[in-house]
Amino acid sequence: MALDQQAKAKIRAEYATVEGDTGSPEVQVAVLTKRIADLTEHLKVHKHDHHSRRGLLLLVGRRRRLLNYVQKKDINRYRSLIERLGLRR
């Protein structure tokens, strides 16, 4: 389930470190978190959609790897990011 451009732009504006920032780990994790939330809602209705479930697991793994990267690079940025996103890592 892809996000539309307006939703991505809103997320980028909120989590960007500098103007025009699209590739920082914070922005990538925020976009992945939104996609994971949308896919989770989809799977609550469509319980037997196993292809989407696999896609969800791939997204969760990608987000986990990015969060591990941020944690290794700067623990304060990591803590602030999970606080802002409401993740329970």
From Swiss-Prot:
SMART domains: Ribosomal_S15 (SM01387)
Matching PROSITE patterns: RIBOSOMAL_S15
GO CC entries: cytosolic small ribosomal subunit
SUPFAM superfamilies: S15/NS1 RNA-binding domain
GO biological process: translation
GO molecular function: rRNA binding; structural constituent of ribosome
Keywords of this entry: Ribonucleoprotein, Ribosomal protein, RNA-binding, rRNA-binding
rRNA-binding among keywords: yes
Keyword Cell inner membrane in record: no
Family, similarity comment: Belongs to the universal ribosomal protein uS15 family.
Chain's role: One of the primary rRNA binding proteins, it binds directly to 16S rRNA where it helps nucleate assembly of the platform of the 30S subunit by binding and bridging several RNA helices of the 16S rRNA.
Matches recorded under NCBIfam families: S15_bact
Subunit structure and binding partners: Part of the 30S ribosomal subunit. Forms a bridge to the 50S subunit in the 70S ribosome, contacting the 23S rRNA.
Identification of the protein by name: Small ribosomal subunit protein uS15
